């Protein structure tokens, strides 16, 4: 086993890569273990690509209401679902590459695979068994591979996963998680969004603007329950 890292971080999301960069800037020998995509869920399958989708929806809305702004648009306004999705994935991929650049610039080693803490101070990295989400971002260049790695300190920053509600298990067809909602083959005629947090409202807003009939189901007394009542109203 090579010389131990001062800090080894499991997870290359916003918690992991930011900690890694700061540790390296402070002079610590640092590595990040990632099994799927640098930048984590937020950058690849969360708030970043949803903002790109919402931007397309916003422009579509403005074009359909051009006359409200004293503008004239000839012909019918339409959209290409695959192009809308492709743009959002391109935005995500660009920022994903940016995370890889920042890690390289700050001399943080990137170890590609799935980590297991074997014992205190030792992490085993094996090829990931998790199927990659489609379309996947390319694996960054210059990474380290599977094997055993020693570390004086280990940070676990493994991020978020979709919640599964008993009896409403996702099948990727009729019942989606946010993964499928972000890369639809076509836009559904109707959609029920379970949960009115930030992610739920983002998807509800996007799909409704693009012409889908949307209903939001929330167990708590207000939408956006984690926010101020004034915002929820």
Enumerate the language-model features and the residues they cover:
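Beta1/beta-strand and adjacent pyrophosphate-binding region of the FAD-binding site
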Residues: 2-13, 187-197
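N-terminal Rossmann-like FAD-binding beta1-loop-alpha1 element of flavoenzymes
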Residues: 6-32, 200-208
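Rossmann-like NAD(P)H-binding beta-loop-alpha module
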Residues: 174, 185-227
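Residues that cap or flank secondary-structure elements
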Residues: 11, 90-91, 195, 227
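Glycine-rich flavin
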Residues: 2-5, 21-28, 33-187, 220-224, ...
């Amino acid at each position: 086993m090579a010389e131990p890292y001062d800090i080894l971080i499991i997870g290359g999301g916003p918690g992991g890569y930011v900690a890694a960069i700061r540790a390296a800037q402070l002079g610590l020998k640092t590595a990040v273990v990632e099994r799927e995509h640098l930048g984590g869920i937020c950058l690849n399958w969360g708030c970043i690509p949803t903002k790109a989708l919402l931007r397309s929806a916003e422009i579509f809305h403005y074009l359909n209401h051009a006359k409200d702004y004293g503008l004239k648009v000839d012909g019918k306004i339409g959209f290409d679902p695959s192009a809308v999705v492709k743009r959002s994935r391109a935005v995500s991929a660009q920022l994903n590459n940016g995370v890889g650049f920042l890690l390289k610039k700050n001399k943080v080693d990137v170890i590609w695979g799935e980590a297991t803490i074997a014992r205190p101070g030792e992490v085993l990295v094996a090829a990931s068994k998790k199927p990659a989400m489609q379309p996947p971002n390319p694996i960054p260049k210059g990474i380290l591979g599977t094997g055993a790695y020693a570390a004086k300190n280990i940070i676990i920053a493994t991020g978020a996963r979709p919640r599964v509600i008993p009896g409403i298990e996702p099948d990727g067809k009729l019942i989606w998680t946010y993964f499928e909602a972000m890369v639809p083959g076509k836009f559904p005629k109707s959609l029920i969004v379970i949960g009115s947090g930030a992610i739920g409202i983002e998807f509800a807003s996007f799909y409704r603007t693009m012409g889908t009939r949307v209903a939001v189901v929330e167990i708590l007394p207000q939408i956006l329950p984690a926010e101020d009542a004034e915002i929820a109203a």
